[in-house]
Amino acid sequence: MFGAEDPANSSLVDNLGLTLPWSLNDPHFLTAGFSASTTTAALMSTLWIIVFAVPSERILGSLKFAITAALIHITSIPLGIGIAHLIEEADLNRWGNNMLADVLLTPDFWVFGVAAFASASMPLLWRRRTRLFLFTITLTLLLYTGTLADVTMLTATIIGTVAGELNRHRKTPGGRWLPGSLTVREARIMTAILVTAVAAGPVLAALNPLTHGPFSSATKLIWQPLVTEEHMHHLCHTDSTSDACQGALDQLQQHGVGPSVANLIPLILTVVLAMGLSRGRRLAWILAVLAQLISIAVLMFQLTKLSADSTDLLWSVNAFSVIVPWLVALAVLVFSRRAFQVKIDTTRISKSLGALMVTWLATAALWILATLFLPHAFHPHPTLGLAFKELPFRYLPPTIETVLSHQLFPRSPAGWAVFEWTGTLFWLVVAATLYHLLMGVPSNKAHEDQENAATLLRSGSGDHLSWMTIWGGNTYWWAPENAGYVAYRVKRGIAITLGEPILGPDSSVSKAELAAQFEEFASNQGWIVAWYSVCEEFSKERINAGHHTLRVAEEAVLSSANADFKGKHFQNVRTARNRAAKEGVSSIWTTWADLSAEMQHKIITLSEEWVSDKALPEMGFTLGTVNELSDPDTYLLLAIDEEEHLHGVTSWLPVYEKGRIVGYTLDVMRRDPQGFKSVIEFLISEAVVIARDHDLEWMSMSGAPLSTPPGVADDGTIGQILELLGRAMEPFYGFRSLAASKNKFHPEHHGWYLCYRDELSLPSIGLAVAACYLNEFPLPNWLKKTATSAPSHS
């Protein structure tokens, strides 16, 4: 890859670059994508080729890659030039030179176009991420700088995406055209990618010294100072308030390592925030929203300072177009706010703020003392007042300082060092502190509670759902003397428990006694208790204590004594197992930590594809997600063929009784729609065999939430709410059809119950249960309407 440093004098640009007007027989039409206009642009293009073109070639194959690149090349240039004509004729590019006067010489447009086309052949996970990044970068560059190359890049990306989708649907008819639902995990990652890509746009624009945008006068300064330090001193000595003095200082302070690092600080901070967003940190979300608002304000301030006609209507239109990427990022952050609910301990935040305050005081003191003890290093002669007036500017990126008036000017190496690095050092400490804060354990207390619950459960006794109590989102009530605990969630003033109380190893009290103690605690807090998904024996104990019960789910339990699957009843199961053997599909019993990174990614991709086909958001509470698979006590059962293709995966939660594992409960189930059709039946049958080999008596296929057998459903308010919720979820999650499919194994059925005391609170209980499953997502309107209109039932 070769690049010319100065296109005005470069024979490379003259020989290869495309200028307007042009025609189809112009040889430059074919050579415009062969090289780049500057050395820096060539380096950036090389990066894009490594990141996008090389993987695309592996996906498409060499021949198809070459054909696609050629087609993208010959279609995107004419369309891009046509769009550039429209933009210029509408006077929507007022920031820089006429796009039609640009020289087009870059491979970036066909690289992005081919990557967009190849993304259609990627797994859903990477298809969405790749397209999001491509479109965010191209749109930001176009709106921020507005060159002919930017227009062509966006055009090529659109062409590649549309062509790729048409090709994908030609191969697999009936697939989705529009993207489906996102898991909470993927929503976080996609938001982080968007925020990072938007912040990277100005940096990428600054890497090109030929940029023609609203801030080109600032970004060009990064590359070469047009004045000497001596000339700046002369201008400022004559009149320190003159435009010539300020302009000379602006040019000098953009050049060198210090200013380069300072200009990268916003991107560095954004990357740190994006890492926090990917982990769902609420603080990262708040700071990211503030960052977008500050960016928009700074951009508008710069535009106003750089433009003489800021009251003109077309100026307003152009200004709005520049801030569109940040507005989009802000809108996405607001729309996806419910995915960022992981709160960080206020004590950790307070300690971090204290450390940052000390750092700021230290750097501010460094600046003040340097100006006072090194008076000859600055001009004019520094005073305490001038030092304090200049202090705020030391914490701003140099590109922003170009539109501000300075009070002091460095005139020696020591002065330049303090001038450039005072604020940069502070912001680097901010970035490191934020990283530690956002990537560490969010809540020490919550983490300790989960660890204590897991330790007590491993040595004590729980029910078939008890391992779910150590998942995130639960709150714990601890019995005196470590006798046990209750995991619960408070929604709408209702304390919804996750199963029954867990007994400690040395507990001298019964579950009924612990339940009574917890109810007293909840009553003191002003909550109403609803015991959710408890077994029949515990529900009878609550009836004796004055509760009412409602059957809410059916658990299917398989005996390991049937691991041979003999008899006519198990014909379908034997068929699934025989077919798996015939197709070379085998099972692996393992944990998440023991899987390779590649297999972990396959599981994540399979889960994302499963969720994308659902209209409802991913749920939680008693329904595990990929996040819960990493638990070291949770076992995974995978169906893999000889080519390492993942056909399906199930996860199994341990069930403890008096300190030992007595069985496992099925949680996550995912299958490849294009893979082995009977994979779930195969995996469940393999789980029964594993139970027998581990001397376990049973394996629970769990309960299908909100699916009750005919004749036992409740007709009252809460029954109607749960029935409607279950019916609405059925097409997307298949709980009821799943309950029917489990009958192939002829399991024992056990009811799970909801126990409640106050019948008047039934509507609130129904909505609270729904809120637990939907987590932070809003409840459907039809569900709220049912709760408020249906009559109560005793």
Swiss-Prot record:
It is a multi-pass membrane protein. The chain crosses the membrane at residues 34-54, 67-87, 99-119, 132-152, 257-277, 283-303, 315-335, 353-373, 421-441. One of its GO terms (cellular component) is plasma membrane. GO terms for molecular function: aminoacyltransferase activity. Keywords: Cell membrane, Membrane, Transmembrane, Transmembrane helix. It comes from the Bacteria. Its main location: membrane. Pfam families: LPG_synthase_C. It is found in: Cell membrane. GO terms for biological process: phospholipid homeostasis. The keyword Cell membrane applies. InterPro entries: LPG_synthase_C, PG_lysyltransferase. Disulfide bonds: none annotated. This is Uncharacterized protein Cgl0966/cg1103. It comes from Corynebacterium glutamicum (strain ATCC 13032 / DSM 20300 / JCM 1318 / BCRC 11384 / CCUG 27702 / LMG 3730 / NBRC 12168 / NCIMB 10025 / NRRL B-2784 / 534). The lineage of its organism: Bacteria, Bacillati, Actinomycetota, Actinomycetes, Mycobacteriales.
